[in-house]
């Protein structure tokens, strides 16, 4: 599509859309204009219509979806309803929310080459575009890999590379970094921002993780109930913080901290927050972690790579560092509900993903697993769920070996939710999905479990809906509900907060905290891990490199760096201020207490100094008593009024 003169790239007027089989419109009178070169962040509660809006830009809606469509959408001056998808697709690159919906080639190279091949380019130019696109997303070394062997985050990178190889005028991305580690997220967003600035590619990006996106976007658009309810420049968006709170959106920690303290400012980083709080320019100092329980043995002072089997005392507990391949070879702990010994596992015999894992998990623990994309987190969960056969070593659950051949005996006791919920949904309604697990129970018990699980995931009002018609976040909660209904003793979750807004994340994780016996979950969201896990495992290259309490592991910068993780902003701020806090609530409580203590000490010191100050001393100082009395500071006796 040849670029038209003028700067309006997307113009939407009074857009209404209703999916086939539904009576309630998903989009309700949307009006939106985006100019050439803008970077627009589109956010809103789960199920508000964000993904649907993106699909209208390249003609998937209404050309492929059907349904009832009205209104006008112009892309670079071209009316989408009157254009064919081939023409639209050359102008609009769409990255889907679920990478598995987009990837169809068996190799990374073929997937990225598909677009340029359809433009009938010569082989040399295609190779050049593939190489450059993979380099931009950090996947050049995976060019010949099978797409089936990639992690979720790596698949997202490949989908982005496929679009970059086409160099569209508009790049529309639906939660493109939701499965990436923090470092990978920044790398991809920096690449996208560079293309946006240098080539004036227009960006429309849907995301819930505002703390990672706000600093890249020029403009923030919020949807709710199929309508746009806020459209502001990034610099002014949090002037309307009540809208974010009302809709259950996650506000970046520095912004939330300032507003909680009554400071009208919207810093997007720890450094900016400290400047607002009067701590000056702290770009370097804020990165220095401190251990306030035992300063002599701070984990943050470690500069050497973690050695195998090394224990570091952190004052309030022990954290183990290293790959732990050779320890704990004896009998498993009697309290362990899960016991792993020297586990080697992978998808190809000559390419192991897990490399000598040893792990004990006790009943009642909530264990978060973090690490870089491809580090083995999902593979570890698949072994715990008996969906992968170990190449070497053993996995024991409830004291018995768990392997694919006898996994049926654990089916009702271990519940597993895939990273991609669509792999689990096959019924005609949400209600049927929740009923499927306990279908052999008595009718009354089935009813009770179904209702309880749907309520726990806040989808009771969607019970008659077709799962495939829901948003990704709603589909994920449906998959979780289908597992909760069998009432398992162990729940395994792979990225359970993907596609969820703040309210649904808190509701889900609080339910697990209060009702689940044992929980093991993978996540890239370090804030969630810190708040809801009793124990944090960090993985890198198929090995566990740290294992301990989250508030202790988080202080080790070297470990975090090795696993492509970063400290949450509130922890960075607390470190600089000399406060041991991992949440806004903790930090505010400490700062408030310190402020009160300072005021009390100042008052007591002033009282003492005033009472000790005699009239003669006042006279000697050249200050007249009557003048002090007139000032209201002290009375004629030299005592503070």
Curated annotation (Swiss-Prot):
Location in the cell: Cell membrane
Protein name: Putative ABC transporter ATP-binding protein MA_0870
Role this protein plays: Probably part of an ABC transporter complex. Responsible for energy coupling to the transport system.
Residues annotated as domain ABC transporter: 10-250, 338-566
Predominant cellular place of this UniProt entry's protein: membrane
Top-level taxon: Archaea
Binding site for ATP 2: 371-378
Region entry Disordered, spans: 286-332
Example GO molecular function: ATP hydrolysis activity
InterPro entries, per the entry: AAA+_ATPase, ABC_transporter-like_ATP-bd, ABC_transporter-like_CS, ABC_transpr_CbiO/EcfA_su, ECF_ABC_transporter_ATP-bd, P-loop_NTPase
Record keywords: ATP-binding, Cell membrane, Membrane, Nucleotide-binding, Repeat, Translocase, Transport
Binding positions (ATP 1): 44-51
PANTHER family recorded: HEAVY METAL TRANSPORTER (PTHR43553)
